[in-house]
A protein has these predicted regions:
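Sec-dependent signal peptide recognition
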Residues: 1-2
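C-terminal motif of bacterial Sec signal peptides marking the signal peptidase cleavage site
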Residues: 7-10
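Buried hydrophobic residues that stabilize the cores of well-folded domains
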Residues: 14-286
Length: 286
């Protein structure tokens, strides 16, 4: 209705329909079987960029500050190492190409060299027409005698397959793959759901606003996902069904039913995850 009404008052060739920008996601609350699972609060700066994410999970609270300089996003905060929190430091660095993440460096502290910060994992992202297609990886670890580091090129570790504007397969090469199914329900532009490199798609990373920097997003919302080992694709290890609550133009709720199957000695398990979304960052209106 909005588009029709605006079209009636547009008179010149230069007039374009104005579609108000949707508010940005500012809070995510998730429960697992009725108990707190995680909570995330997101703030933005005056340029509508992520400024801070406070994530509370498993009784621990992590405050990450996002520092954007040119084409680099540095994330400063605390990490958990062996169950204990570190001192705050820049633990993740993203490098942008255009408006897309081209590389991600995960930092660690070298306990053999006075906690010197080093790059433990570097991910490099490959896109085709702005679709994320694959991720290659380099890992590094310190020598225990403090003499330096060892490095290993892992090559391509993640692969994404797209059909009809949606990721239908994510593969962790070469062993595992997860398949996603969709219906016609569209993903709102401000709902940052993304197929991430996980075979348990229930965490904050799959709906973090940072996902909007990984090129084109899914056109639709998934209804089901299931993963399996490539060598035994008929044995589904776990499956997930998705339901959504839509209020106006906003996804305000999501339910994920998790069914873990007794495959390869794993104990069967059923879980229900309930998500609530709040959008309190009002985009600038004309």
């Amino acid at each position: 209705m909005l588009l029709v009404a605006v079209g009636l008052v547009s008179c010149g060739d230069d007039d374009k329909p104005y579609i108000p920008e949707l508010n940005k996601l500012t809070s995510v609350t998730c429960t697992k079987n009725g108990n707190a699972f995680f909570n995330a609060d997101i703030t933005y700066d005056q340029d509508k960029q992520i400024n801070r994410i406070i994530l509370t999970t498993e009784g621990n609270q992590f405050t990450d500050n996002y520092i954007i300089v040119d084409k680099t996003i540095s994330v400063s905060g605390v990490k958990m190492v062996d169950g204990s929190p570190t001192n705050p430091f820049v633990h993740t660095v993203y490098t942008l190409s255009g408006n897309m993440i081209a590389a991600k460096e995960e930092k660690s502290e070298n306990k053999y060299m006075s906690n010197a910060v080093y790059t433990a994992v570097e991910n490099r992202y490959t896109y085709s027409s702005n679709w994320l297609k694959s991720v290659s990886q380099v890992i590094q670890w310190p020598n225990e005698n403090g003499s330096g580091y060892q490095t290993r090129e892992m090559g391509e570790v993640d692969r994404y397959s797209w059909e009809n504007g949606n990721v239908v397969h994510y593969a962790y090469l070469p062993q595992q793959e997860i398949t996603y199914e969709y219906d016609s329900q569209l993903r709102p532009e401000n709902f940052p759901f993304r197929v991430v490199n996980s075979f348990r798609p229930v965490g904050f990373d799959m709906i973090s606003p940072l996902n909007l920097l990984y090129g084109k997003m899914n056109q639709n919302l998934p209804t089901r996902a299931y993963w399996y080992n490539v060598s035994a694709a008929t044995d589904i290890c776990a499956e997930y069904t998705f339901r959504y609550t839509l209020t106006g133009d906003y996804i305000t709720g999501m339910t994920i039913e998790e069914k873990i199957n007794p495959v390869n000695g794993v104990t069967a398990e059923n879980n229900t995850y309930e998500y609530a979304f709040v959008y309190n960052f009002v985009a600038e209106q004309k």
